[in-house]
Amino acid sequence: VGRALIADSADRVLKVSMELGGNAPFIVFEDADLDKAVDGAMLAKLRNMGEACTAANRMIVHESVAAEFSKRLADKMAKLKVSRGTEDGANIGPLIDDKSRNTVHALVADAVSKGAKVLTGGAIPTGEGYFYPPTVLVDVPVNAEILKEEIFGPVAPVVTFKNEDEAVKIANSTEYGLIAYAFTKDLN
């Protein structure tokens, strides 16, 4: 679609700026301030219910802090109110449509079927609307589709790394390279 739009725009000599998709890594190093990292993850993952090409898609967390980071993230996400934006206290609204919600849930179900564990969320709620709860997955295997595809929903799959080289390798293991997030006290 992007190529077709660019070609059409070029034929008419139009300026073009496009956001064509992302699979943003959110890297948390062992020296990161976990409170700041969790707050950053909440913002980077849940802006517009995760339906943004710049949303953090894959939480890549050093193995020494992964359990604590995942627990804190799941605890914060579990406290969010999923409802219509017109309701008092609403934090997370619906996804754009039923197809999108089903796609998000299929990615979660695929990860779980391959061994991922759900810390919070992970199920389509009953009732009206295209709601999907904020979800944290841990022990996500590398062959899970959720690590390869843009999620476009409020789901945070957590994978671990042992060293910086491995973190970079995991972060770069996608064809989408729009944006990346990193939490560390040492940028060197």
Question: Language-model features: where?
Answer:
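ALDH superfamily catalytic-core signature
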Residues: V1-P141, E164, I170-A171
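Short, intrinsically disordered, charge-balanced linker/junction segments flanking boundaries
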Residues: K185-N188
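Short amphipathic N-terminal alpha-helix
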Residues: A180-F183
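Active-site donor-binding acidic/aromatic loop of nucleotide-activated sugar
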Residues: P157-V159
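Cytochrome P450 core scaffold surrounding the K-helix E-X-X-R motif
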Residues: N143-K148
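Conserved glycine-rich beta-strand-loop-beta hairpin in the small C-terminal domain of fold type I
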Residues: A90-N91, G129-Y132, E149-V155, T174-L178
